[in-house]
Amino acid sequence: EVDRKAGEWVETGVKYSIGSDADVAIVTSVDLDHQDWLGDTRSEIGKAKLGVARRNKPLLVGEPDLPHGFANKVADIGADALFIGKDLRVLEDKNKSSFTSYVKDNGLTRSIGPMDHCSLLPENITLALQALVSAGFSLNSDICCRTISSLSLIGRLQKVKFKGINVILDVAHNPAAARILRENLPVVSGKTFAVASVLADKDWAGIVEQMGTSVDDWLIGQINDNQRALDARSLLKVVYTAQHKGRCYQSVENAFQQAIIEASSLDQVIVFGSFHTVSAVLTVMSKEG
């Protein structure tokens, strides 16, 4: 949400409640995660996330596959909704190296771009640009393009080179996020090593299924700084059940170090599954880099 009185961007989190009304509300996606707070179905989760919406205030929706009852709930709230794929669009260039965002400005469609790809998803960038326009900010297209093309966010499709090896770090910890990670993986001529681990409330089997054959070798590390972490051996059994190759290690750090030892310059190492997983690897890289 955007709170203009406070001059701040406010992320509501999974409990979706703040003390002030929203000038602009954003629902980026609706999928299964945090079910203990939000509900057991996409329909329940969608309605829960709409707790950020306000009557006669802009609501920006980035979920292309709306769950049952979502549109009716938006109508009941009376928010001024704009939807990705309908009101807001992303147009990729032919070689997918850049994209253009189409937003609504005073009822008219406005293009911003082309912008070079960065570690943030074009759809989310489009939502952010629309949020600024909806909040009353005047955007300079050239400045937006230069700024966005240089953006990066730690742990979100973050690409780094470590000891000559291409490493991608992403905090994807549910099947929907794993699918997005898979769809945005670079094509390499070598192998893809996965360094992964998750907490106990995550759909690990669904994550493994989404990553599928895009991973050649799974290196499962034990998360040791959170009691909710699943046992690495249990995670490995799921990998084996899915007919994939893998092994487990006493720590995420050990799993990552082994992946770097085995990988060549033609390979890539992807790190995902939890904020704890990515954090452990970032610590290793900062100490050994």
Describe each PLM feature range.
Residues 1-11, 17, 22-112, 125-142:
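Acidic, Mg2+-coordinating active-site environments of NTP-dependent enzymes
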Residues 2-26, 30, 44, 108-217:
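Nucleotide phosphate-binding/pyrophosphate-handling subdomain across enzymes
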Residues 19, 30-37, 145-148, 219-239, ...:
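Flexible, gly/pro- and Lys/Arg-enriched active-site loops
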Residues 50-59, 188-192, 214-217, 265:
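Short, surface-exposed connector motifs at secondary-structure boundaries
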Residues 60, 64-69, 73-82, 166-169, ...:
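C-terminal helical cap/extension that packs against the catalytic core
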Residues 62-63, 73-94, 114-119, 142-151, ...:
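Beta-strand->loop->alpha-helix junctions that form or flank phosphate-binding loops
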Residues 274:
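Active-site-proximal loop/hinge segments that shape catalytic or ion-binding/gating pockets
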